[in-house]
Each structure stands twice: as C-alpha cells, then as structure tokens.
Amino acid sequence: MRAVVQRVNEAKVIVDEKVVGAIGKGLLVFVGVGKDDTEKDCEWLAEKVSGLRIFEDEEGKMNLSIMDVGGEVLVVSQFTLYGDCRRGKRPSFTEAAPPEKGKELYEKFVDLLEKKGLKVEKGIFRAHMHVHLVNDGPVTLLLDSSRLF
C-alpha cells in the first residue's frame, strides 16, 4: 500500500457538491492499494500513520503523533498512487489493485485507524472527489508498505 500523508489544519472532501468528509487539525491520507497488497500491508500502514511523530511539541520539535495531539484523519482512496510514468506519457496502472480488492483493503485501513481510537472521516471509494485542504508546514510524507521509499 502507498500513502501520501499531509499534516493539515483542515481538510474536506466534496462529492456531487456535498461534503462527505471533513476534519480539523490532523492528517489527510491519500491511500493507494497495490495488486499484491494484503491485510498485513493495511496493518503496517495504520501503525505507521498513527505513530508518525510529525506534530510539534512545546519546544517546536516534530515529536508528537496524531494520537498524542488528538487530531483527526481524513482518508481518501487514490489508485493513481500506483501510476507508473516511467515509459511514455500516459501512466500505467497495472500495479494497482482491482476495485473490489482495493475497496476491501481501503476499508480495512480505515477500520484499523478507528480501532486505535482515532476520529476518521473518508471520501467515497471510486467517486470523483474534490479535496480541499489547508496544509500545515507544509509537511508531506510518502509511505510504501513495500518499503520502496
């Protein structure tokens, strides 16, 4: 699984002109599921996201996690994180999971975050979404359960 994690002051997802998910201070997490991913990848990613120490402590150092600051998480599915742009000008998405598997593991990831006690909002899987956010920092991190980066 791949994720782009952004520290935000606020974020929301709009589908068909309706807000379907919104958070205040916290993390916006774009998640892509690969064709070879399993529940172990979900578990690794949920543990990593919930434990990332990217919020500032009283001394201004990045030393606190989303759990420590009581922040919220907005999770948005994004299969394009598996777009391969190495050849030609059109991305190939052959490494992305098929929709059924992608949805199953996306929902599992959300469930694991909720079980950790986090307030989680989400977009709508496979919908065309408009994502609005106010970055904090900005702080943006790339995660890959295959540890490619």
Swiss-Prot record:
It catalyses: glycyl-tRNA(Ala) + H2O = tRNA(Ala) + glycine + H(+); a D-aminoacyl-tRNA + H2O = a tRNA + a D-alpha-amino acid + H(+). It comes from the Bacteria. InterPro entries: Daa-tRNA_deacyls_DTD, DTD-like_sf. It is found in: Cytoplasm. GO terms for molecular function: D-tyrosyl-tRNA(Tyr) deacylase activity; Gly-tRNA(Ala) deacylase activity; Ser(Gly)-tRNA(Ala) hydrolase activity; tRNA binding. A motif (Gly-cisPro motif, important for rejection of L-amino acids) lies at residues 137-138. The keyword Transmembrane does not apply. CDD domains: Dtyr_deacylase. GO terms for biological process: D-amino acid catabolic process. The keyword rRNA processing does not apply. Pfam families: Tyr_Deacylase. GO terms for cellular component: cytoplasm. HAMAP family: Deacylase_Dtd. A Gly-cisPro motif from one monomer fits into the active site of the other monomer to allow specific chiral rejection of L-amino acids. Belongs to the DTD family. An aminoacyl-tRNA editing enzyme that deacylates mischarged D-aminoacyl-tRNAs. Also deacylates mischarged glycyl-tRNA(Ala), protecting cells against glycine mischarging by AlaRS. Acts via tRNA-based rather than protein-based catalysis; rejects L-amino acids rather than detecting D-amino acids in the active site. By recycling D-aminoacyl-tRNA to D-amino acids and free tRNA molecules, this enzyme counteracts the toxicity associated with the formation of D-aminoacyl-tRNA entities in vivo and helps enforce protein L-homochirality. This is D-aminoacyl-tRNA deacylase. It comes from Thermotoga neapolitana (strain ATCC 49049 / DSM 4359 / NBRC 107923 / NS-E). The lineage of its organism: Bacteria, Thermotogati, Thermotogota, Thermotogae, Thermotogales.
